[in-house]
Amino acid sequence: MKHSSGLIVFDMDSTLIHIECIDEIARLNNRYTKVSAITEAAMRGEIDFAESLTQRVACLEGIKESDLESLFSPIPFNPGAKELIQALQAAGWKTALVSGGFTWFANRVQAALNLDAVVANQLEVADGCLTGKVLGDIVDAQVKAEQLQQLAGHWNIPPDRTVAVGDGANDGLMLKAAAVGIAFNAKPALQAIADYSVNSNNLLEILGCLKQSELIEPVI
């Protein structure tokens, strides 16, 4: 019988949830058109992710932190998110979220799904408002790949028992670092390097990919 446990690392925006949080925040101060255009270019790999994030976050200056709640009540999960995580956890898998998005949202996703770990960018807040800056190092493509490897090491999970799921060009290195890389409703650049592609919004289809890879046979 195959070893049943492993590590699966998810992107957050447009993967576990069906929105791009930074774009939705930008709606709060009428900067959606500008910010979403930069997001699209970054996800296609046309501009550097860290540079794009700095540009986009600068557009959010002055937004009240309390107003973010309206974007996440309820949390906009993609279909099958909870069922997928529950199935994997029941099979002994570690589940993690590694996102170029923000801890304000990622921590809430972690709590709702009972994920084992979360890594994301932290928005700077002063006097209850966003400053337009990110605290600390930016979680970019390289950091995502490194975090997958570090989490696997932390839990003593063999490299050949690791899976990464994402949708954008900044997930490419993470998918390559994993034994199995799954592109979820992804941009063409990511689908081109992924082991499997799911072209629907139902996260439960990821189970089919894992069964094909034999990573979760015969547990689920």
From Swiss-Prot:
Name the domain of life.
Answer: Bacteria
- What sort of enzyme, by top EC class, is this? hydrolase
Please give the InterPro entries that the UniProt record associates with this protein.
HAD-like_SerB, HAD-like_sf, HAD_sf, PSP
Protein residues bound to substrate: E20, R56, S99, G100, K144, N170
Q: What keywords are annotated for this sequence in UniProt?
A: Amino-acid biosynthesis, Hydrolase, Magnesium, Metal-binding, Serine biosynthesis
The positions flagged as active site in the entry are: D11 (nucleophile), D13 (proton donor)
What are the GO MF terms of this UniProt record? L-phosphoserine phosphatase activity; magnesium ion binding
Q: Which cofactor does it need?
A: Mg(2+)
Q: What GO cellular-component annotations does this UniProt entry give?
A: cytoplasm
Q: Which GO terms describe its biological process?
A: L-serine biosynthetic process
The UniProt family comment states:
Belongs to the HAD-like hydrolase superfamily. SerB family.
Q: What is this protein called?
A: Phosphoserine phosphatase
Species name = Idiomarina loihiensis (strain ATCC BAA-735 / DSM 15497 / L2-TR)
Highest classification ranks of the organism: Bacteria, Pseudomonadati, Pseudomonadota, Gammaproteobacteria, Alteromonadales
